[in-house]
């Protein structure tokens, strides 16, 4: 399992999700507003908005918050957010990609660079690490959607590329350009997905020891704590033994 997925699971087990719920809702609302502003405010006519709302619902974001975020874009009083990607290296030479929605590029770049530096890493140029990742669609379902065989069959029929099933649920990947078509086909076979999004998937992973893993997780935690940062991806991998220690 890639490092950031492991990190998410550890934080979930430690209850971190509850501590950052307000910040998470704020970021989800920002994505909804940007999606509504860049297209039509109707999710049936705006694929990006539909996915943003779907993901917000999956995180139990209140309906009022979702509607308010859409109306903010329709009312024309929304800030002008810009999509920015930062790339760099964390401790141990691990590649890290940071996606942000910001109304001030200088502020965000300064914050992200400082976070990398404090962690013993370095912010690089755009393209410095993304060549070692693939941009893919990721669709997740809870285990209750069906057993591994059922989900695999549905994924093949839908035109997906891969399926991974573990104790957290089913993760289906597909081509970036095929997200809408594949997710729609899966919805017909398995019901509404838990999340549907575009992600950066590492082509290869870098194994790290416990010390490096702790440093990397702190880096990711600090990056995600920035209001402008929407997503963080990395290519490190932790052994089951180290994972058990970090999860304790």
UniProtKB/Swiss-Prot annotation:
It holds the Pfam family TACO1_YebC_N. Keywords: Cytoplasm, DNA-binding, Transcription, Transcription regulation. The keyword Cytoplasm applies. InterPro entries: Integrase-like_N, TACO1_YebC-like_2nd/3rd_dom, TACO1_YebC_N, Transcrip_reg_TACO1-like, Transcrip_reg_TACO1-like_dom3, YebC-like. GO terms for molecular function: DNA binding. GO terms for biological process: regulation of DNA-templated transcription. This is Probable transcriptional regulatory protein R02753. It comes from Rhizobium meliloti (strain 1021) (Ensifer meliloti). The lineage of its organism: Bacteria, Pseudomonadati, Pseudomonadota, Alphaproteobacteria, Hyphomicrobiales.
């Amino acid at each position: 399992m890639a490092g950031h997925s492991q990190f998410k699971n550890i934080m979930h087990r430690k209850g971190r999700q509850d501590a950052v719920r307000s910040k998470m809702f704020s970021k989800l609302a920002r994505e909804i507003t940007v999606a509504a502003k860049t297209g039509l405010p109707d999710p049936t006519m705006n694929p990006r908005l539909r996915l943003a709302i779907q993901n917000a619902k999956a995180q139990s974001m209140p309906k009022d918050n979702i509607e308010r975020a859409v109306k903010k874009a329709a009312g024309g009083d929304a800030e002008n957010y810009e999509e920015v990607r930062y790339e760099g290296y964390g401790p141990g030479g691990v590649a890290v990609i940071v996606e942000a929605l910001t109304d001030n590029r200088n502020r965000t770049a300064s914050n992200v660079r400082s976070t990398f530096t404090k962690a013993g890493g370095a912010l690089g140029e755009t393209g410095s690490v993304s060549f070692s990742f693939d941009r893919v669609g990721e669709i997740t379902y809870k285990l209750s959607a069906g057993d591994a065989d059922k989900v695999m069959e549905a994924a093949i029929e839908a035109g997906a590329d891969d399926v991974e099933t573990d104790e957290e649920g089913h993760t289906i990947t597909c081509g970036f350009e095929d997200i809408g078509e594949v997710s729609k086909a899966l919805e017909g076979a398995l019901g509404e997905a838990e999340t549907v999004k575009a992600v950066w998937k590492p082509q290869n992973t870098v194994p790290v020891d416990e010390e490096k893993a702790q440093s990397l997780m702190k880096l990711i935690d600090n990056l995600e704590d920035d209001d402008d940062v929407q997503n963080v991806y990395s290519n490190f991998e932790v052994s089951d033994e180290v994972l058990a220690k970090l999860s304790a």
